[in-house]
Amino acid sequence: MANYECATRTNCFRVKDPEAFRKFMSRVYGGCKLEVWEEKDAAGNIQFGFGCYDGISGYEPESPETADDDCDYGYDEFLEVLQQHIAEDDAVIILECGHEKLRYITASAIIVTSKDIESLDVCDIAASRAAVLLNNPSWCTKCDY
């Protein structure tokens, strides 16, 4: 049996409160160590990015007093809290690419703004585009096998 292996990385983005964001990201976990980067853009604003050689699983409670037994927050909750940190006029694009040997090869993008969360899958996008190029709206294919 093969293991799923992936890498995850974001674009550069701005947040409302850099210190609060750093604190939140210190509680985010995945299959390996999450790296968080920051740099200043041309206007001097702090931009962040993050990534890891695995997927993001969720985040840990802020303190033991606020946690139930075995309490941690999953990926959906991670996205909801991330959404609260993003600057109003910016977006986080979380890119993940992975594989399980050659059986599954996946690539996705999750776009998170302060108001919306949308998920894109490269197989779906490619199949839709192929149908357009073939001028056959009902064309479909199997990408995972």
Show the residue positions of the predicted features.
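Short, extreme N-terminal segment that most often corresponds to the first beta-strand
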Residues: 1-28, 144-145
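A contiguous, surface-oriented mixed alpha/beta subdomain in the mid-to-C-terminal portion of proteins
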Residues: 2, 32-37
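Charged interaction segments
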Residues: 28, 39-145
